[in-house]
Amino acid sequence: MKLPIYLDYAATTPVDPRVAEKMMQHMTMDGVFGNPASRSHKYGWQAEEAVDIARNQVADLINADHREIVFTSGATESINLAIKGIAHFYHKKGKHIITSKTEHKAVLDTCRQLEREGYEVTYLEPEANGLIPLARIEDAMRDDTLLVSIMHVNNEIGVIQDVMAIGELCRSKGIIFHMDAAQSAGKLPIDVQQLKVDLISISGHKMYGPKGVGALYVRRKPRIRLESQMHGGGHERGMRSGTLATHQLVGLGEAAAIAKQDMESDNARIRTLRDKLWNGVKHIEETYINGDMEQRFCGSLNVSFNFVEGESLMMALKDLAVSSGSACTSASLEPSYVLRALGLNDEMAHSSIRFSIGRFTTDEDIDHAIKVITQSIDKLREMSPLWEMFKDGIDLDQVQWAHH
């Protein structure tokens, strides 16, 4: 068992050794290192072939046509290209966008930028379980609504939105639907032949591939058009210029192929470990799970331990690599905006920890985690005057705190 135990797979995943091995064959002089756009010699042809294979592997993962895959530097770029690209290309059709308050910062900040450019954005409230009711999306739709952007799996609480129904609704109204699948691609089945989604953002490093690479699925039938955000040599059919990073793309492709092959067995094992972890900590008094327990990705568990400060708990859990909130915002001491949107108060949001389990988590890891969590909570609550008051039956909401 390696300490600290890594339970932060929603932040990033280690590169699968099979992926790393494949990548190494596309870097050095004795490998396939050429520029895929070099059409005049063998080095370029070999690199182009490697990229074509990777494109097909990513397409196969979501049952798409290989021509619908645009390679990017990651999900953040894919999201920017999707949302800004649609908004700018179709601006004469309308300037209204619908999203939710619990989206990733990449979506929220892109929408904020468009607001500065004169677009109007509706940010939907989720239910207390993290799910967005379909009727709420429909009620927000207007004649000038151009785009709906809703994530498939939430990065903090792991809830799965009903993207099948959202896609049907958007298609029936002639509105473009973008889905952020950074947390679901390679972990949950996605079939674009069944799903009426127009754009899908995909990340490499969330599915045991390398960091710094991702993809955007852009539907061909009905055809979706985008305005490029990166100008240059006209790579990726003019949608994303820049020399293709062969080794990165080979890694992304291999990760996608492995994910497709191992998804069922991976998830069965991960679900067993997740259930074991939850069963090991749920007996702790004043412990709550955040987000819907049924409509949830099996590798994610967001738990609030009331009367324990999240940051002190993380320090106490030094043997566990976990986070409070997403990795992108965990450096700030603000409570998670996702948990606040679910209606949690500051104290409960601050006392939450995200545990995310993955391909390389073991039974032994979970046993150790349960032991460490239980001991740490007992120890921290022993030092907490609020816990003492709560145990004495004092209603803390009624206490008038004096300011000094």
From Swiss-Prot:
Its EC number is 2.8.1.7. The active site is at C328. One of its GO terms (biological process) is [2Fe-2S] cluster assembly. Its cofactor is pyridoxal 5'-phosphate. It holds the Pfam family Aminotran_5. InterPro entries: Aminotrans_V_dom, Aminotrans_V_PyrdxlP_BS, Cys_deSase_IscS, Cysteine_dSase, PyrdxlP-dep_Trfase, PyrdxlP-dep_Trfase_major, PyrdxlP-dep_Trfase_small. One of its GO terms (molecular function) is cysteine desulfurase activity. It comes from the Bacteria. Gene3D superfamilies: Aspartate Aminotransferase, domain 1, Type I PLP-dependent aspartate aminotransferase-like (Major domain). [2Fe-2S] cluster binds at C328. Keywords: 2Fe-2S, Cytoplasm, Iron, Iron-sulfur, Metal-binding, Pyridoxal phosphate, Transferase. It is an enzyme of class 2 (transferase). The modification N6-(pyridoxal phosphate)lysine is found at K206. Pathway: Cofactor biosynthesis; iron-sulfur cluster biosynthesis. Pyridoxal 5'-phosphate binds at A75, T76, N155, Q183, S203, G204, H205, T243. It catalyses: (sulfur carrier)-H + L-cysteine = (sulfur carrier)-SH + L-alanine. GO terms for cellular component: L-cysteine desulfurase complex. It is found in: Cytoplasm. Belongs to the class-V pyridoxal-phosphate-dependent aminotransferase family. NifS/IscS subfamily. Master enzyme that delivers sulfur to a number of partners involved in Fe-S cluster assembly, tRNA modification or cofactor biosynthesis. Catalyzes the removal of elemental sulfur atoms from cysteine to produce alanine. Functions as a sulfur delivery protein for Fe-S cluster synthesis onto IscU, an Fe-S scaffold assembly protein, as well as other S acceptor proteins. This is Cysteine desulfurase IscS. It comes from Shewanella denitrificans (strain OS217 / ATCC BAA-1090 / DSM 15013).
